[in-house]
Amino acid sequence: MLDEWILVSPHRAKRPWQGQNEKVAPDNRPEHDSTCYLCSGNVRSNGIKNEEYTDCYVFENDFSALLQEEVLFENHSQPLFQQKPERGINKVVCFSPKHNLTLPEMELADIEKVVKTWAAQYIELGSHDYINYVQIFENKGSAMGCSNPHPHGQIWAQSSLPTQVEKTQKNLLSYYIKNNNSLLKDYVEEELKLQKRIVIENKHFVVLVPFWATWPYETMIISKRHFGNIIAMNKEETSAFAAILKGITVKYDNLFETSFPYSSGIHQAPTDRVLHPEWHFHMHFYPPLLRSATVKKFMVGYEMLGEAQRDISPEQSAEILRNLSDIHYKANS
């Protein structure tokens, strides 16, 4: 996908650990927190009051990284210093009014509302003539830098293709031109034959640990049918996507019986008004935890200076996740 190699070293997993241990967040959050900027009816830090929302709630980020007005700057004559203006829109998507929930604990019907909200935002944001890519993502847990525990994600829509997306598109397009088929469709069909890295499967989607996975329990959700973006899903596929989202996040929580941190995001076709037959809808999950609820994988040293390295094989990770219960551990307590 990115033309990058991964060093796999499963023999390192048992080395002694005297390094940093993550703090496990207390599991006693109220359903509504009067001090939370994202809870229904509360006033945010900029003085704007949230609506008394009952399911998904979307608003423009009060601290947007991207501005809708183009920022002008002086161009450098020296080609070693290259820069360009960027425009965009940042939004926050509250998944639920309930402060004490996360995606795996939500009802399936409510997760489906989140998926439909993502689709509506893809259409709305992509309709702007200067928006060429819509990045939907979630940072869950303080270990992934999440600034608020209320269940929420973000959408960053911008005029340029982000670097990771641009690299992915380049490789998807190269494969499509050479093989007249989707790279990810061919890939998921091969994985389904082998079954070694499959975690969950339903009629329309597959969750697997990718052959090239970097993070210990990294997974991808890949559609079985070839389509390029979230709005191409039919009603049945939307329900199936919500179900498999719940399925993998429940397994994540069950792994160490904790609210499992991760960064996740959808990769899909740009909104640049060009046909993109090379794009195949998929979603990435990058969780940092390695050995327990308190020990995470650090991408430092060799990983920063050389290439990514993992301490457990993709096949081992897939087997561990696959064998976990589909019922959330809290439901059994």
Q: Where are the regions a protein language model picked out?
A:
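Acidic/histidine-rich, metal-coordinating catalytic segments
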Residues: 264-268
